[in-house]
């Protein structure tokens, strides 16, 4: 079992790129492998909410959206930190243009959509670089998601949880399933971290 800190993970990603892959390919591998595992678990297409931050964690979610809609899923996407995305996340947002069954929604629309219910809620707001306290608006969003129905999935690490120390904001997203990539992070294996991660699945993405 491989376990990497956030800093070690960044080093491994850079090493993979130095050997000839690209950050775009790593994101594609992460999002596609998570989507494929999820659809094996839930072969019946339904409704999903994907909550994205503006960085590469959200980019993984946008890749998932592309693969899920191809299998008949109806996807709502919420950009929780605005629409000024990282270059890789923006690239994957643009790849969704023109695809059916994908809708971008606002925070104002979210509560009504949650009342209708989602089969799956995928959270990709903050990734392994998070530490400290959640911004007020993200804490409120996590509270809303935590009290909603549907299978809850975190990408890499639940937002609000420090992946190295397992320190958690009181409003940390509470996942039923966490997909992590290339290696486990220390928080996935700690008793306090497991409270928020629940089942953690480590997926290979082409990183040693």
Each predicted region: which residue ranges?
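YjeF_N-associated NAD(P)HX repair module
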Residues: 1-4, 10-11, 16, 118-208
